[in-house]
């Protein structure tokens, strides 16, 4: 009967150990996934910080600092959660060690029981009673240890559930922060695009105004040049007509018109000025 109880206790301990190992493996996998997600979020946050430092203004920087402070608080909570996980892992190692010790004890006890059965024929009833009492006391101790291990297992399971709940809440908080960061980033990108469009429209309007001004100045300079050219050509043609008229049609026009226009003093001065150039030197040409 004692051997059956010991075997059943051993099976229970082995199954509990396997369940505990599976739970701890799931916790480790969840922690690894959470660490990968946190690393990705940190890389995304660093990228957003870099972009915001390049294209941000003081108000946006202040808002980003607040968001960064919130993220740092979340990271600190995650670090505390990781420390709690490490503590649970250490406790799990302790439990595994105690379970292995208990298994070794059970193995030794079972071997003793087998040896007891083998030597049962050679022992006396008093010795058998003493050995049976020893086995009962050892079974009681093992049951106490098993109860303690069960309590530790329940405690670890509760902590694992609490940790899973904390991980879920932290993932929800990270998702909400990521959505807020993406929304802020999109708003900043939209405002930047709108400002770029307004600057482009303003530069286009300024270019159009400059084009209109340059075209107006070019047209004005062309009109002035044309007027000067036409005036010069008109005066040259008028002067040609006057010279032609004086040369071939009415050579005495100035002689007849100047006395009517100018006074005698002016005519005398004009005559003194023009007489040397109009007088022909013919003395050398006349016959002697």
Swiss-Prot record:
The gene is Tmco5a. The keyword Acetylation does not apply. It is found in: Endoplasmic reticulum membrane; Nucleus membrane. Belongs to the TMCO5 family. This is Transmembrane and coiled-coil domain-containing protein 5A. Only detected in testis (at protein level). Keywords: Coiled coil, Endoplasmic reticulum, Membrane, Nucleus, Transmembrane, Transmembrane helix. It comes from Mus musculus. It comes from the Eukaryota. Residues 10-189 form a coiled coil. PANTHER family: TRANSMEMBRANE AND COILED-COIL DOMAIN-CONTAINING PROTEIN 5A, TRANSMEMBRANE AND COILED-COIL DOMAIN-CONTAINING PROTEIN 5B-RELATED. One of its GO terms (cellular component) is nuclear membrane. Its main location: endoplasmic reticulum. The chain crosses the membrane at residues 227-249. Pfam families: TMCO5. It is a single-pass membrane protein.
């Amino acid at each position: 009967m004692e051997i059956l109880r010991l075997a059943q206790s051993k099976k229970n301990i082995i199954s509990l150990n396997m369940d505990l190992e599976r739970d701890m493996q799931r916790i480790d996998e969840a922690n690894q996934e959470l660490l990968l997600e946190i690393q990705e979020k940190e890389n995304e946050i660093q990228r957003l910080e870099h972009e915001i430092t390049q294209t941000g203004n003081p108000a946006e920087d202040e808002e980003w600092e607040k968001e960064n402070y919130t993220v740092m608080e979340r990271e600190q909570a995650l670090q505390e959660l990781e420390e709690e996980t490490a503590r649970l892992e250490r406790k799990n190692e302790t439990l595994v060690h105690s379970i292995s010790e208990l298994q070794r004890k059970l193995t030794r006890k079972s071997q003793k029981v087998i040896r007891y059965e083998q030597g049962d024929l050679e022992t006396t009833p008093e010795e058998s009673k003493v050995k049976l009492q020893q086995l009962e006391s050892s079974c009681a101790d093992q049951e106490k240890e098993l109860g303690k291990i069960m309590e530790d297992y329940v405690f670890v399971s509760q902590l694992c559930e609490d940790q899973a709940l904390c991980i879920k809440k932290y993932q929800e908080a990270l998702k909400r922060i990521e959505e807020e960061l993406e929304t802020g980033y999109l708003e900043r990108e939209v405002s930047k695009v709108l400002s770029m469009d307004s600057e482009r429209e303003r530069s286009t309007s300024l270019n159009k105004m400059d084009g209109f001004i340059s075209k107006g100045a070019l047209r004005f300079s062309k009109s002035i040049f044309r007027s000067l050219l036409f005036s010069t050509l008109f005066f040259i043609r008028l002067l040609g007509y006057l010279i032609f008229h004086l040369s071939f049609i009415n050579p005495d026009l100035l002689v007849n018109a100047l006395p009517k226009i100018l006074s005698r003093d002016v005519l005398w001065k004009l005559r003194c000025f023009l007489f040397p150039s109009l007088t022909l030197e013919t003395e050398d040409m006349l016959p002697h």
